[in-house]
Amino acid sequence: LLLKAYKKVPGGKVAIYGQVKNAQTWALCTMNMFLHGVDDARIWQGDTLSNPQNLEDDHLMTFQVVVANPPFSLDKWDSGFLAEAELDSKGKIKMAAELDQYHRFDLGVPPSSKGDYAFVLHMLSCLDSKNGRMAVVLPHGVLFRGASEGIIRRHLIENLNVLDAVIGLPANLFYGTGIPACILVFKKNRTCRDVLFIDASGEGNYEKGKNQNILRPCDIEKIVQTYHARKAVDRYAYVASFQEIQENDFN
C-alpha cells in the first residue's frame, strides 16, 4: 500500500514511514522497499497502537498523507495497554483514555473487541494539522455501530469535521475475508461540512472473479474522478449535508 502511494507522487519526492506488528510482515515489507529502490524508507516493527515508533521528542510525528489497511475489527487491540490498567466497578480490567500518553483516545475508547476506530484515531493523531489527509480501509460496521464507536463517529463529523468521503467497496475484494469494506477519507481543515458517499459495490463497477472480485483500472478511475468532482451521480454517488447526517443520528 505504501509503495502504491509512493508511485503516485510525481518525481518520487516523498519520505515513507510505516509500522507493522508482525515480524515476518515487517521483514517482507522492508525487503520489498529495497527491491523497488526505496532505500530510505523507515519501517518499524511493533504494535502501532500500544507502542508507536513514529516519535519525535516523545510526541507523535505528523504527516501530510496517511494510508492504512488495518486488520478488520481487531479483537483485544488494547492488550498492550492493560498492564497499567485498573479494575473497574465489576472487577474487570478495562482500557481507559488516560492510559495512552499520546492522548489519541480522548474522543472515546473503542470497544476491546473491535479495534477499527483505534486505528482511525491513531492515524488522525499523526495527521498534519494544516493540510493532512488520510484514507483507511475498514469494514462497514464502522459506519453504523453504536455505543463508544457511535460517540467517536459523531465527534469526528460534528466537532472535528474531518470525514470527507465514504467509498463503499464490493464484497470479496480482499484476501482472507469476503465481507464488504469501505474506504474512509479524512481531511484536516475542511471548508465544507458535507460528506461524499460513493457506492462502488454495484453491478458493473467491478469484475467478478471466481475466488475474488477485482476493481479494474477503469473502476478505480471512476472512483477517483467522482471523488474529485464531488457531485451526485445516479445510483453511484451522493453528497450528504451535515443536517442529513445529523438527522440520521450520524449513521
What are the residue ranges of the model-derived segments?
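Conserved SAM-binding loop of SAM-dependent methyltransferases across substrates and taxa
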Residues: L1-G11
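Short alpha-helix immediately C-terminal to the canonical SAM-binding loop
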Residues: L2, Q24-L28
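Short, surface-exposed basic-aromatic patches at helix termini and helix-loop junctions that form
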Residues: K8-P10, L35, R154-L160
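Short acidic capping loops at alpha-helix termini that bridge into adjacent secondary structure
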Residues: G12-V14, D40-R42, D194
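Conserved SAM-binding motif I beta-strand of class I
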Residues: A15-V20
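S-adenosyl-L-methionine
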Residues: A27-L60
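A conserved structural/catalytic subdomain of Rossmann-like adenosyl-cofactor enzymes
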Residues: D57-N251
